[in-house]
């Protein structure tokens, strides 16, 4: 949620930002109009309350009963006006609040302006794409042949976009999760969390998933519970409605969770394999920091995610996302791993800085110094990394001519020393 003062003091800045992300700049005028009506109503209520207070004192001083009754009746009318105006102010406040919840964040000046994902900018490519002397297979062929991916049974029990992982495939995923979390905790200084997979609507509002993305989230019927689309939601809401001490910052958390997304997928797009699913696992990094340090913390976050890519020795690239692909971030970078069997780059991490946009919605603040007025923290999050796309990259980059898959060296201690699948 944006600070209302931006609309009052820098409306042109907000209009420009909305235009860049494809939202109607006219929304700024709606906000300003509602804010003005609300403030006028509040001012009038305060004036009437002062009038009522003065009138009440006057009534107390009036000894003539008839005159006192007239003044009491007049004060009752004032009270009725106050009640009516209070209701109007509350209705306007709710309308304004709901409008602000639906508005996007503002992109930083350095974010490239674009119309869609094709306008994202490749910052750099790391690693060398290998060209083996045999026909590279896609992961779905490898996985089925190795007996570690079962698509038929997954679809039979749950429908399209579901699969069953078996045997060493599961062990590979567990190894990845443990290795990634150990890296983030031991090397990068994160605190590991185990969080609920179901959260209330308020938590979804806090991270910006509601109301805008309601149709992409699974809701438990007849309850106020929603399945999390990412650990970002429960982890960010850990400090909802709290005032932190400056000494507690920065807070760096990491969590592994399943993620559930009711994405509307185009028929025929990415039908095969495990690239696009309604349920998948992910390791997520979340930070809550002082505003002055948030930009530096973003590149530290990206570096933390890159360390996973480097450890696996899989070619990857870093992209800066354009204004059309930011979501609710103010600046965002993606990491994509090369998948030779699919002949494409796969997003495995999206690292974003949100400024105080989420903190304002979730009311997460900190006190810069003892006795000082609380201020909103800045939040950041990024995948560290997303599964099962990392598994796709491992299967397709580490496959051998005989159909087996070499286990990346860093994962072998987590797999009991197993060096090869198949």
Curated annotation (Swiss-Prot):
| An example Gene Ontology biological process | seryl-tRNA aminoacylation
Q: What is its EC number?
A: 6.1.1.11
Q: Which residues form a coiled coil?
A: none
Localization per record: Cytoplasm
- Key words of the record: Aminoacyl-tRNA synthetase, ATP-binding, Cytoplasm, Ligase, Nucleotide-binding, Protein biosynthesis
Note the superkingdom of the native organism: Bacteria
InterPro entries associated with the record? aa-tRNA-synt_IIb, aa-tRNA-synth_II, aa-tRNA-synth_II/BPL/LPL, Ser-tRNA-ligase_type_1, Ser-tRNA-synth_1_N, SerRS_1_N_sf, SerRS_core, tRNA-bd_arm
Q: Name one GO molecular function term.
A: ATP binding
Matches recorded under Pfam families: Seryl_tRNA_N, tRNA-synt_2b
Its annotated pathway reads: Aminoacyl-tRNA biosynthesis; selenocysteinyl-tRNA(Sec) biosynthesis; L-seryl-tRNA(Sec) from L-serine and tRNA(Sec): step 1/1
Catalytic activity, as annotated: tRNA(Ser) + L-serine + ATP = L-seryl-tRNA(Ser) + AMP + diphosphate + H(+); tRNA(Sec) + L-serine + ATP = L-seryl-tRNA(Sec) + AMP + diphosphate + H(+)
Among the entry's GO cellular component annotations, what is one?
A: cytoplasm
> Where do the annotations place L-serine binding?
230-232, 284, 383
Name the positions where ATP binds.
261-263, 347-350
What Gene3D superfamilies would the database entry show? Bira Bifunctional Protein, Domain 2, Serine-tRNA synthetase, tRNA binding domain
Q: Could you say which protein family the record assigns here?
A: Belongs to the class-II aminoacyl-tRNA synthetase family. Type-1 seryl-tRNA synthetase subfamily.
Recorded hits in PANTHER family, A to Z, give: SERINE--TRNA LIGASE, SERYL-TRNA SYNTHETASE
What is the role of the protein in this entry?
Answer: Catalyzes the attachment of serine to tRNA(Ser). Is also able to aminoacylate tRNA(Sec) with serine, to form the misacylated tRNA L-seryl-tRNA(Sec), which will be further converted into selenocysteinyl-tRNA(Sec).
Q: NCBIfam families this protein is in?
A: serS
Print the domain comment field: Consists of two distinct domains, a catalytic core and a N-terminal extension that is involved in tRNA binding.
Q: How does it assemble?
A: Homodimer. The tRNA molecule binds across the dimer.
Name this polypeptide is given: Serine--tRNA ligase
Q: Which organism is it from?
A: Herpetosiphon aurantiacus (strain ATCC 23779 / DSM 785 / 114-95)
Traced from the root, the source organism's taxonomic lineage reads: Bacteria, Bacillati, Chloroflexota, Chloroflexia, Herpetosiphonales
Gene for this protein?
A: serS
């Amino acid at each position: 949620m944006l600070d209302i003062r931006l609309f009052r003091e820098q409306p042109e800045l907000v209009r420009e930002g909305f235009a860049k992300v494809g939202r109607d700049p006219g929304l700024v005028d709606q906000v300003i109009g509602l804010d003005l009506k609300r403030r006028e109503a509040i001012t009038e209520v305060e004036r009437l309350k002062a009038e009522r207070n003065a009138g009440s004192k006057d009534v107390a001083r009036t000894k003539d009963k008839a005159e006192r009754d007239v003044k009491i009746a007049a004060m009752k009318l004032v009270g009725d006006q106050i009640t009516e105006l209070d209701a109007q102010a509350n209705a306007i406040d709710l309308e304004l609040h709901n409008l602000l919840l639906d508005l996007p964040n503002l992109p930083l000046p350095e974010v490239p302006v674009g119309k869609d994902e094709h306008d994202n900018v490749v910052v750099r490519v790391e690693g060398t794409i290998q060209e083996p002397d045999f026909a590279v297979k896609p992961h779905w062929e490898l996985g089925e042949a190795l007996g570690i991916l079962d698509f038929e049974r997954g679809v039979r029990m749950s429908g399209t976009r579901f699969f069953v992982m078996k045997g060493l495939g599961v062990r590979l995923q567990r190894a990845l999760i443990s290795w990634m979390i150990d890296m983030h905790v031991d090397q990068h200084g994160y605190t590991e969390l185990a969080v609920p997979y179901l959260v209330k609507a308020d938590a979804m509002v806090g991270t910006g998933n509601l109301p805008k993305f309601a149709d992409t989230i699974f809701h438990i019927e007849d309850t106020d519970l929603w399945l999390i689309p990412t650990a970002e939601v429960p982890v960010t809401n850990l400090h909802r409605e709290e005032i932190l001490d400056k000494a507690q910052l920065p807070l760096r958390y990491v969590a592994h969770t399943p993620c559930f997304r009711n994405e509307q997928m185009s028929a025929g797009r990415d039908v095969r394999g495990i690239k696009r699913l309604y349920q998948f696992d992910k390791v997520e990094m979340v930070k809550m920091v002082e505003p002055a340090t948030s930009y530096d913390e973003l590149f530290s976050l990206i570096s933390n995610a890159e360390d996973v890519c480097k450890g696996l020795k899989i070619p990857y690239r870093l992209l800066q996302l354009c204004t059309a692909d930011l979501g609710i971030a103010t600046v965002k970078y993606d990491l994509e791993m090369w998948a030779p069997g699919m002949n494409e780059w796969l997003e495995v991490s999206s690292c974003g800085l949100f400024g105080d946009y989420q903190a304002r919605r979730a009311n997460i603040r900190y006190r810069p110094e003892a006795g000082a007025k609380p201020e909103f923290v800045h939040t950041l999050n990024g995948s560290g990394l997303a599964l099962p796309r990392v598994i796709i990259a491992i299967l397709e980059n580490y496959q051998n001519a005989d159909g087996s898959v070499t286990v990346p060296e860093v994962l072998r201690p987590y797999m009991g020393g197993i060096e090869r699948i198949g």
